[in-house]
Amino acid sequence: RWVKNQMVEAGRNRANSIGFPDAYAFTKAMSEQAVEETRSQIPLTIVRPSIIESSWKSPTSGWIRGFRMAEPIILNFGKGTLKEFPGIPEGIIDIIPVDLVSSAIIACAAQEPSSDTTIYQVASGSCNPIRISKLADYVHKFFGENPIYDEKNQPIAPAKWRFPGRGRVESQLRRAQGLLGQAEQTLTKLPIRGRQAMIVADIQNRKDEIDKALEYVTLYGKYVECEALYSVDNLLTLWDSLSEEDKSVFLFDPRSIDWYEYVYNIHLPTVITKGRVKTSPSKSSAKSRSSRLRSQVLDSQRQLAVFDLENTLIASNVVSSWS
């Protein structure tokens, strides 16, 4: 695992050093160059989408396969885990619904082949931009009106993002990570019983949440700080060349997107459904099965000693003891 993490970090640093936000974008650029150099006389058309999110209209509004970039960030914001995220408030988050991308690919494939490489960028930032601050406002409003409920059956109030620098957010998360780690180490050296055991479990849960938040900031922070705009002139020229009949079937004009309608009424409900989060108070106040089992195991009235009599796991025959 250590070797894998070091290789990932090396790839990320290499990509950053030549202007790419991560190794993913870097390898896509390398792939384009490789295809261009080896295509010989084969016609080549490259379609470059920006950040792909759920569908605008087809096959149904909100269709998406798996989670993309924004969904984990949105869910953790709704859960109260991610209270801050870096970014430039007036910056542009360049997202595009998946059905516009698929329609553009079909339209490109139907064109007469050219001897030159043709590039179509399927993006929204240069012709129908949505500001990061506006997207954050939509998300804040949505979770204010449709809150996620916690384990105690209480609605989670969404935080208001202030968009500090990425370095500041990472420092805050790493500091919290360190403090929780120290608390965990201290408590695990003491006999675990009753309320103390529940505190240890809560610290571990919180530590896991901080780890995830830090991962999202590290992975996606550069995307929301990027101020690049991608020209869609070729895409719009292709769109204008279509018949009205084709336009009604293969929609890929980014200017047609109503961002409030898309984000608030289509994408965010999809994220909630896919995330399977609790969006209403439970009818019963009973504890969850996992909470009941944990309480039973950690009951202060219980005593447990575990022995490794065959001496197969560790050198000592007493693994742990509670009394």
Task: Annotate each language-model stretch with its function.
Residues 93-96, 130, 230:
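Residue-level signal for the nucleotide or nucleotide-sugar donor/cofactor binding architecture
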Residues 51-53, 126-128, 320:
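Short, solvent-exposed loop/turn segments at secondary-structure junctions
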Residues 296-323:
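Active-site neighborhood of HAD-like aspartate-dependent phosphohydrolases
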Residues 262-287:
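C-terminal capping/lid region of NAD(P)-dependent oxidoreductase domains
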Residues 289-296:
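Short, basic/aromatic recognition patches
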Residues 108-220, 224-227, 234-241, 245-252, ...:
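Mid/C-terminal beta-alpha module of Rossmann-like enzyme folds, strongest
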Residues 1-12, 16-25, 29-112, 135-143:
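NAD(P)-dependent short-chain dehydrogenase/reductase
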